């Protein structure tokens, strides 16, 4: 959900809440009639929407970081910057590239560790576990990946999800992608459901007996 849309929703909620609060100081009979009708709890819904959107934005940051690893793997392994062609071939010198991928993986873990939401706890924990497993795999393979002359083959096994063999991290990276995808979908659904509560039908209570 776009930030402008969320801001508009929250502003509308604020106006509704303000109007509801001001009505309580007015006519008693009018208040009694109003209280017999139950609409959505706007204060509660406002918090749900704000919290849901914060989680979704954080997950999108993680998705962007993952995409950067994907982009590096697809386009930068075995390459160097060329003044005319953009990227030119330079095989088997991928040490700095792998160090960058590792740095991004630790940032992903940091972002996921900061996520807190009871409704998404299971999916957040699953993504955290996959993130930690991927980062640890890169560290475990430091003999092959922690040097300047990392071969193209080893680099692909570490961070290219579509590579034939994935023994140095690519398999774990694929699972991390999947877990974050599941988390993102759940976060979007949670936000959509919170917004839907705004349109919940008003329920009239049975009049109280004198």
UniProtKB/Swiss-Prot annotation:
Outcome when changing residue 61 to Q: Bacteria are non-infectious in mice, no antibody response in mice
Location of this chain's protein in the cell: Cell outer membrane; Cell surface
Signal peptide start-end: 1-18
N-palmitoyl cysteine lipid sites: 19
Phenotype of gene-disrupted mutants: No observable effect on growth in vitro, infects ticks normally, required to infect mice. No change in ability to colonize the tick midgut, no change in bacterial migration to the tick salivary gland. Loss of infectivity in mice, including SCID and NOSCIDg mice (deficient in T and B cells, functional natural killer (NK) cells which also lack complement C5). About 40-70% more uptake by murine peritoneal macrophages and human macrophages (B.burgdorferi strains B31 and 297 deleted); no change in uptake by neutrophils. Whole bacteria no longer interact with human plasminogen.
Primary subcellular site in the record, as a coarse category: membrane
Record keywords, A-Z: Cell outer membrane, Lipoprotein, Membrane, Palmitate, Plasmid, Signal, Virulence
GO CC annotations, alphabetized: cell surface; external side of cell outer membrane; membrane
Lipid-binding residues (covalent, S-diacylglycerol cysteine): 19
Consequence of substituting residue 56 to V: In strain: 2591
Family membership noted in the UniProt record: Belongs to the OspC lipoprotein family.
Self-association state and partner proteins as the record states: Homodimer. Binds human plasminogen on the bacterial surface, also binds human plasmin. Interacts with tick I.ricinus salivary protein Iric-1. Interacts with human complement C4 beta chain (C4B); whole bacteria bind to wells coated with C4b. Binding is inhibited by human complement factor C2.
This protein's name: Outer surface protein C
Organism: Borreliella burgdorferi (strain ATCC 35210 / DSM 4680 / CIP 102532 / B31) (Borrelia burgdorferi)
């Amino acid at each position: 959900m776009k930030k402008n849309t969320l801001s508009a929703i929250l502003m509308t909620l604020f106006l509704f809440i303000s109007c509801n609060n001001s009505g309580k100081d007015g006519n008693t009979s009018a208040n009694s009639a109003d209280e017999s009708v139950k609409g959505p709890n706007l204060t509660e819904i406002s918090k749900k929407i704000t919290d849901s959107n914060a989680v979704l934005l954080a997950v999108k940051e993680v998705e962007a970081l993952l995409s950067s690893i994907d982009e590096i793997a697809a386009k930068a392994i075995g390459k160097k910057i060329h003044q005319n062609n953009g990227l030119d071939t330079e095989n088997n010198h991928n040490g700095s590239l792998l160090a960058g991928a590792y740095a991004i993986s630790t940032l992903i873990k940091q972002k996921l560790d900061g996520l807190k939401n009871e409704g998404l706890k299971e999916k957040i924990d699953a993504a955290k576990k996959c993130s930690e497993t991927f980062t640890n795999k890169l560290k475990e393979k430091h003999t092959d990946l922690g040097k300047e002359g990392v071969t193209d083959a080893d680099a692909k096994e570490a961070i290219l999800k579509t590579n034939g063999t994935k023994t140095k991290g690519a398999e774990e990276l694929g699972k991390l992608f999947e877990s974050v995808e599941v988390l993102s979908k759940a976060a979007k659904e949670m936000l959509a459901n919170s917004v839907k509560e705004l349109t919940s039908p008003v329920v009239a209570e049975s009049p109280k007996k004198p």
